[in-house]
Amino acid sequence: MKKTLVALAILTAAGSANAGINLYDADGVKTDLSGAAEVQYRQTFKEDSDAELRMDDGDLAVNTTVAISDSLNAVAAVAFEFEDGKVTNDELWVGVAGDFGTLTAGRQYMLADDAGVGKDYELGGDGIDFVQANGDQVVKYVFDNGQFYGGVGALITETNPDNNADEASVYEGRLGARFGDFDVRAYLYSGEDVNTDNFDVFGDDKVNVDIDGYQIEAEYIVNAFAFAASFGQVDYELASDSSQKIEADTAALAGSYTMNKTTFAVGYTYWSPEAKGTVKKMEEANVFYANVTQQLHSNVKVYGEIGSSDTDNSEFGYVAGMEVTF
């Protein structure tokens, strides 16, 4: 009962905190609650599509850290995602953390989920896509000493949605370094029997593909300006027939300027797929976008974005949205 009362008191007092709400902090145990809600009015690039009010994002997470000793902590998290009218438990993991880094295991997002330098909200086009970026059987290790950082991860096995005999497996790595305001990093990714419906050019709605790729990224911040660039290559090979594949090059440029609580950003994304075998040819894409974000509060922002793609049968896109976090 005492813990409950303390949690309620802190919940009330910390309602405006932008890094989550501290529910409990005593006896070496710290527990935080965080969440986000985001709604947009969006017109996509798709030709003849109608603008729609879209529930873009809803998240709720509880994270805890327990001090086992002066140099070792136990960590855990449970998180839920609200999307398409459904509630999904997208994170449930445990681990240990210390000066050596953090080692976690369970249902969680992989390092590949962080890849990308775009400053867009919705209209940035197709950038790097490693397809499988989370799973139930993920083991991940990350390390960061301030200047150098890195990590390795593995999706040990993941039964495909169709419950067939093939199970996906993924191995990945990230290595980066910071030199003052300059940050450079690289991602490596290799997956087998990854189930996806992203590529109808293979002839089926859903197929299993083997994926191998990399992404190199760089970011530089000078005063109120931020610049970013990336280049990556990914091969998508049909698991049942290695002669059928897509080799894709992707690149991105982005920049932003922040003035008080307003941020202006522009960006460009390039996507160039090359089909091999009898795979249907895919279209090259050049996408440009611009947006402005107004930070009304440390927990509240509103934004507007416009974008244009040179692909066939595409039209001008726009987005207006609002996000509230706690």
Swiss-Prot record:
Tell me one Pfam family matched here: Porin_4
**Locations listed in the record:** Cell outer membrane
Query: May I have one GO cellular component term?
Result: pore complex
Q: SUPFAM superfamilies in the record, alphabetically?
A: Porins
Q: Which GO molecular function entries does the Swiss-Prot or TrEMBL record give?
A: porin activity
Q: Which UniProt keywords apply?
A: Cell outer membrane, Ion transport, Membrane, Porin, Signal, Transmembrane, Transmembrane beta strand, Transport
**Any one biological process term the GO annotation gives:** monoatomic ion transport
Its induction, per UniProt?
In response to elevated hydrostatic pressure.
Where in the sequence is the signal peptide annotated? 1-19
Q: Mainly localized where?
A: membrane
Q: Its domain of life?
A: Bacteria
- Topological category with respect to the lipid bilayer: Multi-pass membrane protein
Q: Which PANTHER family does the entry link to? A: OUTER MEMBRANE PORIN F-RELATED, PROTEIN YDDL-RELATED
Family to which this protein belongs: Belongs to the Gram-negative porin family.
| Assembly and binders | Oligomer.
Its annotated function is as follows: Forms pores that allow passive diffusion of small molecules across the outer membrane.
- The protein's name is Porin-like protein H
* Organism encoding this protein: Photobacterium profundum (strain SS9)
